C-alpha cells in the first residue's frame, strides 16, 4: 500500500485502522486484488456478444454453447509463487482456477497451461520448468481434470523466473448458475474444506511487488500448500450442494483468503457481513485473528445458505468427510465486522475494502521496431537451428505427463492447432491459448492483436467457429512508464482485434510486477479462446495421402521481427508481424467454408517458425513427406527464399486436398497458391528448380522430438 492510500484510508475511516483492519485493507488494496492500475483500461475490452451469458465481474465467465449447455471459463496466473516454489506454486495455480469454475456451479472438464521460462541452458531454469510441469501434472491428474493443451516458451527475459498461466473450462446447465454475491441479509456463511494455516499469508501482497534475487528463501511462506485429494472431494460436494438449488452464493477462498471472499460476497449488492474468526478451523496452533483473516490456505470454499437449509447442505459436506463451520452471516448494514472470542476486533464500512481508487501511472511510449537485413544463412542451417529450438520442438514430453483423456471427452489431443472436447453427440468445444511476447516487445499493440488472431486461426484450423475469449496479461511493474504504456497499447490491440472478429472477453487476469532483481519481463498477453465445432467437421493438421496438393492461403511478407529465426541468430530488431483484420477474417471464413464443404483433408495455421516449420509439423503429424516450390508461395516482392520460409506473417494457413477439389477451393480464396504435393518420406524444398533441402522424415523427427535430450534425459 502506498503512503497516499494509507492517508486516504485514515481520512475515510476517521481514525487509524487497528492491526487486523490494516492487514485486511492491505490485502484488499493490493494490486493483485484491486486491479487499481488496470481497471480503467480494462473497460475498453468488449465483454458482450450473442454468446455471453455472464461477462467479467465474477470468478469466471459463462458462455452459451446451446440451449441446454453453458461453458464456464476463466484464466489465472500464479507467477510469483511458481518462481519461488515451482511445484507448489503451479499446483495451487491449477487448484485455484478449478475452484473459480466450480464456484459458478460448473463441473471443471479441462485445463490449458500457457507456461514460460528462461533459457533451458541454465540449471535454475530447467528446475523451474521441470517442477512447474510436475506440479500441474500431479494436481490435475489427482483431481481428475485433464490438461488438454497450452503453450510452452523460453525467453531470455524470463531468466530465473516463470510465467504460469492456467485456463479452465467447466460445463453446466444454464439454470444451475450460482453467483458469487448475496442478495439478502440473514444468510449463514459456511466455510468448507481444509483447515486454515499460515501458508499464503500476504500472498496477494507478495504478488503485487517485484521479486528480490533472494525470493526463494524470503518468500516461501507466501506460497500456498496444495492438497488435490481435498480438492477432488470439494468438487463433488460443491456440485451436489449446488444441485439442491439452495446455495445462495458461492466463492472460493483464493487471493486475500476469508477477508476477500466474504467481503466481496456480501458487499457487491450493498450488504454487510459479520465474521467470527475464532470459529475458523485452524491447522496450526496459536494462530491470531489477523493470520486467520488473510491466510490463503487452499481447498476452501465459502457458501451462503439460509438457516433452514443449513442441515441439508452440511449433510452433503459430511458425506464427503469435509469439515465445515458457520463462520459468519450477512447483515443489512453495509459494514464488515470481525469478532474474536466475542470481542469486536474489526469494524469497517464494507465498501472501504472494495472501493480502491484507480492509480494512473505515467505512460511513456517507445519505438524499437527497425527493419534490418536478414542475415545470409543457408536454408539448411536455418532449418536445423529453428527446428531444434526449445520453442519449436515437440512438447510431447510435457503433455505425456498429463492425463489428458480423463473424463473421456478429449477428441483432439494436445499438440495440434487446438484441442477438442466432446460436449454432446453432435458438437465439440475447441479450446486453445496463444501469445507471443517477442512480438509484443517490439510492438505491444500489434503483438496483442496477433494473440487474438492466432487463437481465431487455431480454432478455425480444427473447424471451430469462435465463441468467446479470456485474457491473461503478464507485465512488469506498472510504475515503469514504458511498461505502463505497453500495457495500455496491449489493451487497445486486444480490444480492436476482438471487436473485428465479433468476440467478447468474458473473464481475465492481470499480473503486474513480474520481474526479478529489477529485470522486467517482456509484455506477455496470453489469450485463450473457445470455439464450437461439429464433430463430423473436425479437421487435423496431418498430411493424409501421397499425391494430395499442398497450398498456402494468405500472403507472406518481410515480417521477421520477433520471429524464431531472428531470435536464434541474436537479432532483436525487425518489424513485428501485422494483423490485417479484414484479410484475416476473409481467410478464416474461407477455411471454415472449405472444411464445411469437405474440400480439405488437412489444415494448419502458420505461426511460430513460419511456413517451413508448419510444413514439417504437418509431415511429422501424418508420417508423410512433401515436395514444395518456395517460388510458388504468394509473397511480397523482394523476399529471399529464407525470408519466405521463416517469416511469421499472420493470416496464413497451409491446406492439403485432393486435386479434384482444386477449382472449388480456388474460388473460395483471394490469396491462394498451390506450392507442392504430399510425398512418401522425403521432405524437399525447391527453389529455381533446384533442391535446397532434401531431408529424410526420420532425421527431421529426431530433431523435432529432442526436448528430452535438451533436458539431459
Curated annotation (Swiss-Prot):
Mg(2+) 2 binds at residues 100, 252. The active site is at 32, 78 (proton acceptor). Substrate binds at residues 77-80, 99, 224, 296-298, 511. GO terms for cellular component: cytoplasm. One of its GO terms (molecular function) is phosphoribosylformylglycinamidine synthase activity. Pathway: Purine metabolism; IMP biosynthesis via de novo pathway; 5-amino-1-(5-phospho-D-ribosyl)imidazole from N(2)-formyl-N(1)-(5-phospho-D-ribosyl)glycinamide: step 1/2. It catalyses: N(2)-formyl-N(1)-(5-phospho-beta-D-ribosyl)glycinamide + L-glutamine + ATP + H2O = 2-formamido-N(1)-(5-O-phospho-beta-D-ribosyl)acetamidine + L-glutamate + ADP + phosphate + H(+). Keywords: ATP-binding, Cytoplasm, Ligase, Magnesium, Metal-binding, Nucleotide-binding, Purine biosynthesis. Mg(2+) 1 binds at residues 76, 509. It is found in: Cytoplasm. InterPro entries: PRibForGlyAmidine_synth_PurL, PurL_linker, PurM-like_C_dom, PurM-like_C_sf, PurM-like_N, PurM-like_N_sf. Its EC number is 6.3.5.3. It is an enzyme of class 6 (ligase). ATP binds at residues 35, 471, 508. One of its GO terms (biological process) is 'de novo' IMP biosynthetic process. Part of the phosphoribosylformylglycinamidine synthase complex involved in the purines biosynthetic pathway. Catalyzes the ATP-dependent conversion of formylglycinamide ribonucleotide (FGAR) and glutamine to yield formylglycinamidine ribonucleotide (FGAM) and glutamate. The FGAM synthase complex is composed of three subunits. PurQ produces an ammonia molecule by converting glutamine to glutamate. PurL transfers the ammonia molecule to FGAR to form FGAM in an ATP-dependent manner. Monomer. Part of the FGAM synthase complex composed of 1 PurL, 1 PurQ and 2 PurS subunits. Belongs to the FGAMS family. This is Phosphoribosylformylglycinamidine synthase subunit PurL. It comes from Thermococcus sibiricus (strain DSM 12597 / MM 739).
Amino acid at each position: 500500500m502506498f503512503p497516499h492510500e494509507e492517508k486516504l484510508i485514515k481520512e475515510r475511516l476517521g481514525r487509524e485502522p487497528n492491526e487486523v483492519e490494516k492487514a485486511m485493507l492491505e490485502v484488499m488494496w493490493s494490486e493483485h486484488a484491486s486491479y487499481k492500475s488496470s481497471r480503467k483500461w480494462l473497460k475498453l475490452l468488449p465483454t458482450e456478444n450473442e454468446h455471453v451469458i455472464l461477462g467479467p465481474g465474477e470468478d469466471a465467465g459463462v458462455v452459451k454453447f446451446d440451449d441446454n449447455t453453458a461453458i464456464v471459463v476463466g484464466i489465472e496466473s500464479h507467477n510469483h509463487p511458481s518462481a519461488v516454489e515451482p511445484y507448489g506454486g503451479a499446483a495451487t495455480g491449477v487448484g485455484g482456477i478449478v475452484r473459480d469454475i466450480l464456484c459458478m456451479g460448473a463441473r471443471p472438464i479441462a485445463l490449458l497451461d500457457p507456461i514460460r521460462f528462461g533459457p533451458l541452458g541454465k540449471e535454475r531454469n530447467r528446475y523451474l520448468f521441470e517442477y512447474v510441469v510436475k506440479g500441474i501434472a500431479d494436481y490435475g491428474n489427482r483431481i481428475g481434470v485433464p490438461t488438454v493443451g497450452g503453450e510452452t516458451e523460453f525467453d531470455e527475459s524470463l531468466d530465473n523466473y516463470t510465467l504460469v498461466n492456467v485456463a479452465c473450462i467447466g460445463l453446466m446447465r444454464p439454470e444451475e448458475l450460482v453467483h458469487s454475491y448475496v442478495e439478502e441479509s440473514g444468510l449463514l456463511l459456511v466455510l468448507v474444506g481444509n483447515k486454515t494455516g499460515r501458508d499464503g499469508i500476504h500472498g496477494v501482497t507478495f504478488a503485487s511487488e517485484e521479486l528480490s534475487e533472494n525470493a526463494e528463501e524470503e518468500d516461501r511462506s507466501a506460497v500456498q500448500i496444495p492438497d488435490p485429494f481435498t480438492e477432488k472431494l470439494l468438487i463433488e460436494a460443491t456440485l451436489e450442494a449446488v444441485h439442491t438449488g439452495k446455495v445462495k452464493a458461492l466463492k472460493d477462498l483464493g487471493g486475500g483468503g476469508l477477508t476477500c471472499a466474504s467481503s466481496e460476497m456480501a458487499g457487491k449488492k450493498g450488504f454487510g457481513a459479520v465474521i467470527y474468526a475464532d470459529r475458523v478451523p485452524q491447522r496450526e496452533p496459536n494462530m491470531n485473528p489477523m493470520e486467520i483473516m488473510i491466510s490463503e490456505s487452499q481447498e476452501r470454499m465459502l457458501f451462503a445458505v439460509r438457516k433452514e437449509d443449513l442441515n441439508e447442505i452440511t449433510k452433503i459436506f459430511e458425506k464427503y468427510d469435509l469439515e465445515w463451520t458457520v463462520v459468519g452471516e450477512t447483515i443489512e448494514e453495509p459494514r464488515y465486522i470481525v469478532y474474536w472470542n466475542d470481542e469486536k476486533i474489526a469494524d469497517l464500512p464494507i465498501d472501504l475494502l472494495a472501493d480502491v481508487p484507480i492509480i494512473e501511472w505515467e505512460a511513456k511510449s517507445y519505438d524499437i521496431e527497425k527493419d534490418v537485413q536478414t542475415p545470409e544463412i543457408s536454408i539448411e542451417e536455418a532449418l536445423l537451428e529453428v527446428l531444434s529450438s526449445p520453442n519449436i520442438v515437440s512438447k510431447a514430453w510435457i503433455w505425456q505427463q498429463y492425463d489428458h483423456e480423463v473424463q473421456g471427452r478429449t477428441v483432439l489431443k494436445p499438440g495440434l492447432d487446438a484441442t477438442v472436447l466432446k460436449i454432446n453427440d453432435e458438437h465439440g468445444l475447441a479450446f486453445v491459448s496463444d501469445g507471443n511476447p517477442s512480438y509484443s516487445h517490439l510492438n505491444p499493440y500489434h503483438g496483442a492483436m496477433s494473440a487474438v488472431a492466432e487463437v481465431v486461426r487455431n480454432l478455425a484450423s480444427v473447424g471451430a467457429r469462435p465463441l468467446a475469449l479470456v485474457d491473461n496479461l503478464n507485465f512488469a511493474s506498472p510504475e515503469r512508464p514504458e511498461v505502463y504504456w505497453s500495457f495500455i497499447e496491449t489493451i487497445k490491440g486486444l480490444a480492436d482485434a476482438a471487436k473485428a472478429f465479433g468476440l467478447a472477453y468474458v473473464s481475465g487476469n492481470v499480473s503486474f510486477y513480474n520481474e526479478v532483481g529489477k529485470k522486467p519481463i517482456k509484455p506477455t498477453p496470453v489469450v485463450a479462446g473457445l470455439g464450437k465445432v461439429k464433430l463430423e467437421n473436425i479437421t487435423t493438421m496431418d498430411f493424409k495421402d501421397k499425391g494430395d496438393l499442398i497450398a498456402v492461403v494468405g500472403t507472406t511478407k518481410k515480417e521477421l521481427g520477433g520471429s524464431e529465426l531472428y531470435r536464434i541468430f541474436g537479432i532483436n530488431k525487425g518489424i513485428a508481424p501485422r494483423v490485417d483484420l479484414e484479410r484475416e477474417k476473409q481467410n478464416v471464413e474461407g477455411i471454415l467454408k472449405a472444411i464445411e464443404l469437405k474440400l480439405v483433408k488437412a489444415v494448419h495455421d502458420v505461426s511460430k517458425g513460419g511456413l517451413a516449420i508448419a510444413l514439417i509439423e504437418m509431415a511429422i503429424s501424418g508420417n508423410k513427406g512433401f515436395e514444395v516450390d518456395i517460388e510458388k508461395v504468394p509473397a511480397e516482392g523482394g523476399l529471399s527464399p529464407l525470408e519466405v520460409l521463416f517469416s511469421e506473417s499472420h493470416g496464413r494457413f497451409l491446406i492439403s486436398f485432393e486435386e479434384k477439389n482444386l477449382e472449388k477451393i480456388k474460388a473460395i480464396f483471394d490469396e491462394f497458391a498451390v506450392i507442392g504435393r504430399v510425398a512418401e518420406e522425403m521432405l524437399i524444398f525447391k527453389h529455381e528448380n533446384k533442391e535446397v533441402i532434401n531431408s529424410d522424415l526420420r532425421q527431421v523427427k529426431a530433431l523435432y522430438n529432442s526436448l528430452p535430450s535438451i533436458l539431459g534425459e
